Swiss-Prot record:
Designated name of the protein: Cobalamin biosynthesis protein CobD
Gene name as annotated: cobD
Membrane topology term: Multi-pass membrane protein
GO process annotations (BP): cobalamin biosynthetic process
Native species: Listeria monocytogenes serovar 1/2a (strain ATCC BAA-679 / EGD-e)
Compartment annotation: Cell membrane
Amino acid sequence: MILLFYTSSFILDCLLGDPYSWPHPIKAIGNLIKWLTIILRKIFHGKSLYFAGGLLFVLTVGMTGAVSWFILFLSAKIAYWLYVAVFVYLGYTTLAMTCLAKEARKIQRTLADGDLAAARVQVGMIVGRDTDKLTAEEISKATIETVAENTADGVIAPLFYLFIGGPVLALMYKAVNTLDSMVGYKNEKYRAIGFVSAKMDDIANFIPARLAWFFLVIASFILRYDGRASWQIGLRDRKNHTSPNCAYPEGAVAGALGITLGGTHEYFGETVVKPTIGSGTKPVSEKEISQTIHLLYMASTIAFIMFASIYLLLF
C-alpha cells in the first residue's frame, strides 16, 4: 500500500509540477530559514556564527521533521483518507522533476527567440551565479549544469529518502538542501553561518549524487547519447568541482552530450575559479538544454523503477 502512495506522489509531480499558487512546504521552510537567520545574526557575531550555523541547521531540520510528522499524525487521527491524501501530497512536494524541466524549457525557448536579456533574467532564477553578462552559450551551460545537478538533489535524492523514511525524511532532506541553497555559500557573508549546512548537504547527497550518475549513464544509453563517455567522464571528472557531489551528475551529462561544463564564474561579484567538467569541444546551445531535459526525465523514471523494485523485494 505504501508503494502505491509513493507512486502517486511521483505521478503527481509528472503531471502537475509545482503550481506557484499552491501551498508548498519548501516555501515555508525557506521562510523559516530567513527568520531564524535574522534572529541568530542579531545574537551571534564573528566566529560564534559557526555555532549559530549549527543551531540554524538543527532548528530548521528538526522543526521540519517534527511539524511534518505531527501533520501526518493528526491527519491519521481524523480520517484514513485524509492521512493518505496528506502523505501523498507531502511526498509529491519534495520532487522537482517537472518544475525543473519547465524552467529549463522557458530558458530554451527564450534563447531560441534570441532574447538574451530575458534569458539572463530567467537563468538567474535557477542558478546562484551572476548572470547579467552571460552569453547565450554560457546561459545554455548554466541551465544544463543546474538541470544535471538538480537531477540529483531535486529528484533522485528526495526519492531516495522518500523510499527510506517516507515524507518526513524526504522533507527533512529538503530542509537540508534548502539550507545549503540559501546560506551554503563560501563568501564573507555566509561562510560562517552556512558552514554546517553546506557540510551536511554534502553528506546528505553523497549517495544520491552517485546514484544520479549511474542512472544518468543508463539514461544516456537508452536515449542513444554517448553512454560510454557519460560513464567515463562522470568518473574521471568527479573531483572537478568545489562540491564533492555535483561533478558526478554534471560529468555524466557532459559526457553524454559531448560538451564541456564548469569553469570560472562570478558569484555575488566575486570570481570563483572552478575546473572544467568534460572534454567536448562543440558549441553548447538550446539543443543541448532539450537533451538534458530528456536525460532528467529518463534518469528520474529509472530511479523510481529501481527504488520501487528494491522496496518490493524488501517489503
